[in-house]
């Protein structure tokens, strides 16, 4: 959802609205909310705005607990937990000055952990250009390991709780996302809203606005629309085995058209 261009609020609202649809479908089939609720998990993206992303994750955890308890009647704590995986935002990676992507990914990874993610994937610095090299993939992994074992960020749950700014931002995101979920409910739920192109249109509009803000220089992207380099080095890129590519294309063609 976020990689397609949604805002943080839209990602939060649309993701949880989808969750509501799945839970309701399971309950309609007679499943016990306290049993299957423990096994639900979500997938979130982490974008560039450090504190907004932390607040988004905090709001998600709070909102999902309320949804499971108030809307669906869950009574067990584990059935109300918002378990989620986070991937750093591939759409924020830039082809220019690719080493800058290491910094972007590090900040996104740190925000994910501070927000309470249970698992994490860090993108490699060269993924805006090609499949990552082994060195780039290892650096992305080491980013996670340094955050986990050297920074102290993971020593305590929700370390930014009580921060006036973070708490206010969390409340704001929750209120905006809740209002958007209510709008989806008015459209008949997530599935019906998708059929009416509601989510798609909202995401498309947000993606256009965000790209326009970069193109106009309103949103600064270091190395892209500000602090450019006139002597850009050609980075090492993963070499593709063209023979293997051709074989796979042949197999795919045979699968699609066996005759």
Question: Where in the sequence are the language-model features?
Answer:
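Generic beta-strand/beta-sheet core signal
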Residues: 43-47, 85-89, 105, 122-125, ...
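Flexible, glycine-rich loop/tail regions that form catalytic "lids" or insertion modules at the edges
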Residues: 134, 142-145, 149-259
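A broad, low-amplitude sensor of folded, mature protein cores
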Residues: 64, 118-119, 143, 258
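Flexible, glycine/charged-enriched surface loops at secondary-structure junctions
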Residues: 28-38, 68-82, 119, 150-160, ...
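Helix-rich catalytic cores of soluble enzyme domains
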Residues: 1-111, 125-141
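Metal- or metallocofactor-binding catalytic centers and their adjacent structured scaffolds
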Residues: 115
